[in-house]
Amino acid sequence: MVKFASVVALVAPLAAAAPQEIPNIVGGTSASAGDFPFIVSISRNGGPWCGGSLLNANTVLTAAHCVSGYAQSGFQIRAGSLSRTSGGITSSLSSVRVHPSYSGNNNDLAILKLSTSIPSGGNIGYARLAASGSDPVAGSSATVAGWGATSEGGSSTPVNLLKVTVPIVSRATCRAQYGTSAITNQMFCAGVSSGGKDSCQGDSGGPIVDSSNTLIGAVSWGNGCARPNYSGVYASVGALRSFIDTYA
């Protein structure tokens, strides 16, 4: 399922209150100021929707499924706050660009341009991107953050930011879980085989970072939330850097 905020499908992307089910953080802990200075919350028509990462003063990276097919005018982002409902700086969008090869769950990234510039400083910073062509190493630790649901099918989403650390899962293992064709080289997987820790509805588009706090991916999709033997699936920044660099 996708991981924006809503409940409809079981295998799709991860956003908030929409026609597809999207993940929140399951099995996580509260984030502290400064943990993710580049994270933004994305609301749609005033309600929780997705997450994203601030790349510079005018640009946010999120999942394509968070914005594809929806009116640009309905979106607002909030930066510089652990709360998705107050504090920080807000901006509407001036433009949306979805990856030109976005299809199904593949190439699931979009670039959002902001109507209001957001300077760095205080609790706000810009994401450091994984190198072009890089691929997260299986077994290494990664941390994902968001305001999504804390359980699969959960009807409420947290106001304050949560985070959870999970290991990178090899592409071979992830393909065994989902099927060879479902997991492309533009994706990577992370999760605990026993379940209990994952992104969930409402976390879509939000950041997953490596141990150096480098942005390696965006929350994309999965089979439910935190189920045993089903990893969370992420759009790969390293594999999709050319798109990001062209439009950021």
UniProtKB/Swiss-Prot annotation:
The record's listing under PROSITE patterns reads: TRYPSIN_DOM, TRYPSIN_HIS, TRYPSIN_SER
Name its cellular compartments. Answer: Secreted
Keywords for the protein's UniProt record, in alphabetical order:
Disulfide bond, Hydrolase, Protease, Secreted, Serine protease, Signal, Zymogen
Which cysteines pair up through disulfides? They are 50-66, 174-189, 200-225
Q: What is its main location?
A: secreted
A GO biological process held by the record: proteolysis
Citing just one GO molecular function, the answer is: serine-type endopeptidase activity
- Reaction catalysed by this enzyme: Preferential cleavage: Arg-|-Xaa, Lys-|-Xaa
Asked if the keyword Protease belongs to this entry, the reply reads: yes
**Which Gene3D superfamilies does this one have?**
Trypsin-like serine proteases
Q: Which SUPFAM superfamilies match?
A: Trypsin-like serine proteases (SSF50494)
Catalytic site: 65 (charge relay system), 108 (charge relay system), 204 (charge relay system)
Give every Peptidase S1 domain span: 25-248
State the signal peptide span. Answer: 1-17
Query: Which cellular component appears as one GO term in the record?
Result: extracellular region
User: Which residues form the propeptide in this entry?
Assistant: 18-24
EC number(s): the record gives 3.4.21.4
Q: Does the record bear Cell cycle in its keywords?
A: no
Q: Where is this site: Required for specificity?
A: 198
Give the similarity note.
Answer: Belongs to the peptidase S1 family.
| Annotated protein name in UniProt | Trypsin
Q: Which organism is it from?
A: Fusarium oxysporum
